[in-house]
């Protein structure tokens, strides 16, 4: 690869910008959720359409929504289940987080739940004008005072697609100019986070929705998995390289070197130092380790 001059002017966020992002996040994190106690169990939650809804009623509605025939599981891992469903007349995405084992449960005695962190970050992004699905509510559940699970509810956004379908190796039929434009806009979307004093710790392409992918005037990336967002910070070089590796590594094990280099080049348009020999070595080594782990899991 050849080193080129930066095409864009990136300036780290000012301290006031970081303070604002941090303040918005902390305010949202302290959302006054209704809480009830019954039979050794505690429920806490909120639903924006009906602020006075009891958490027990919201839990009942969520359980009904995810078991209806028209619901569909989008993603399921050992501890996370993402379901598309209908709730209170809305089409929604319900993301449930289960805690695994006593150590993790004890840890969340001292940390906000993933759902509450998602809620706070999503509220912050929307107030800053950064695209993300509308946060609608969240639930937290404790058993005998110990955290057990939580769930986050966001609006379903019609007409969007998983960004990995357009940027990954499965997008092999996409014209090169489309891939280049998508990569350029993705780099810009991540830089927008940085400029707003926000760092996302997991920027793989499956953590973004893509809106109007073929229309350059309306094309938009929407951020998901916002429990991984850190608000009120200035991302440093290590964090930027990590994001580049996450994007490049998420293209899939069959992506070509040219496709990965395209991602690096679009980021380097904002951060020319990414083309330095040492930075490139870090990126390639880190990406290779990531891909090796994926192959072992297959």
Regions found by a protein language model. Name each.
Residues 22, 27-88:
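ATP-binding glycine-rich phosphate-binding loop
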Residues 203, 208-213:
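Hydrophobic residue at the +6 position relative to the catalytic HRD Asp in the kinase catalytic loop
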């Amino acid at each position: 690869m050849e080193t080129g001059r930066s095409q864009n002017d990136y300036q780290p966020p000012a301290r006031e910008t970081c303070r604002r992002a941090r303040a918005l996040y902390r305010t949202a994190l302290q959302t006054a959720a209704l809480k009830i106690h019954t039979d050794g169990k505690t429920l806490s939650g909120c639903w924006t359409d009906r602020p006075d809804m009891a958490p027990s009623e919201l839990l009942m509605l969520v359980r009904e929504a995810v078991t209806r025939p028209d619901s569909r599981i989008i993603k399921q891992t050992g501890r996370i289940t993402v379901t598309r469903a209908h709730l209170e007349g809305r089409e929604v995405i319900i993301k449930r987080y289960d805690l695994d084992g006593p150590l993790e449960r004890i840890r969340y005695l001292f940390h906000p739940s993933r759902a509450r962190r998602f809620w706070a970050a999503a509220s912050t992004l929307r107030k800053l004008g950064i695209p993300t699905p509308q946060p609608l509510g969240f639930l937290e559940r404790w058993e005998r005072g110990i955290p057990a699970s939580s769930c986050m509810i966001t609006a379903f956004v019609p007409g969007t697609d998983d960004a990995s379908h357009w940027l990954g190796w499965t997008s092999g039929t996409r014209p090169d100019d489309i891939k280049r434009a998508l990569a350029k806009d993705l780099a810009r979307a991540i830089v927008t986070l940085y400029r707003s004093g926000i760092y996302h710790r997991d920027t793989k392409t499956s953590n973004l929705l893509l809106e109007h992918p073929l229309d350059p005037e309306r094309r938009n990336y929407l951020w998901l998995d916002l429990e991984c967002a850190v608000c009120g910070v200035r991302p440093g070089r290590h964090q930027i390289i990590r994001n580049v590796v996450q994007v490049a590594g998420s293209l899939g094990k069959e992506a070509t070197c040219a496709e990965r280099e395209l991602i690096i080049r679009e980021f380097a348009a904002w951060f020319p130092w990414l083309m330095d020999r040492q930075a490139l070595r870090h990126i390639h080594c880190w990406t290779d380790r990531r891909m090796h782990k994926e192959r072992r899991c297959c």
